[in-house]
Amino acid sequence: MNKKVITRQDLTEASEKYKNWGKWGKDDEIGTLNFTSPDDIINAAKLVKKGKVISLALNFDNNGPQGAKTSYPAMGRTNPIHTMLRTGTDAYSGVLDHRGIRASDDMVVMPLQCGTQWDGLGHIFYEDSMWNGYDCREVTSAGAQKCGIEKTKSKMVGRGVLLDIPKVKEVDALEDGYGITCNDLEEAEKFHDVEIQKGDFVIVRTGQMEAKLKAGSWDGYPGGDAPGFSFETLDWIKEKEMAGLASDTWGCEVRPNESEKGINQPWHWIAIPIMGLTMGEIFYLKDLAEDCAEDNSYEFMFVAPALPITGAVGSPINPLAIK
């Protein structure tokens, strides 16, 4: 049976079917993050039973995935460049003794979406529009005048749920090019005895990152073929009313894309600017998956605020699962 190819007409229909513009008012700039209520956060805190904190981030260094061989151009993204401004050698030499202190200092230069990160609502446009109908030209050389990531700085806290698709299918990792379906996600909920609730942050493991790390090479990871969400999962996302969604791949959706030539990342076209979904990519999920399998609990408190960089369309993060 041939897979359906997503066309421009499909995108047009989806843009109306899944549109959340105006749902939280004409001035809204944070989209589905509105789904998380104060009570949701209180209840998420009650999930903490053993005081264990699990990071879902890769380290930010020159060993990251950017620059690896890939079928897709990097669009200027590099791994972080970390530079020391003052070192211990400087201190030993007495460079700052005249100021009465010995210290080190440093700086980093990096694309904001080069590692574990959130895609902000100013990142992807649907034709000439961004989230909530704002003109795409609101994102200027000075940054996003609307939907900047700083608008979310008191968000990204709530109940997290891990859906471990490879575990359900009894494989180490999903094959590159495998499109995760609504049925896969529903099966994972049942398998893990967990139900996605309104306002949740849903983390979906494919195993691809772990496969790359095990192989000792990121080749093919940034923009290459990958397992990921199929276009049909927009139905599931809409139904569940989740606050955010993240995965362990470079771009969340299945690659090669299911779309006709000329349409790149069709799932993104709808999820971000039309639905207002904040999306996490390049999440490191091995430790969380192992812990969830050990205690058979796939829900946890999730804390992953973006850096409030004014006008940014994405942000590096250190997401935490607290159990």
Where do the protein language model's features map onto the residues?
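Active-/binding-site microenvironments in catalytic and ligand-binding cores
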Residues: 1-323
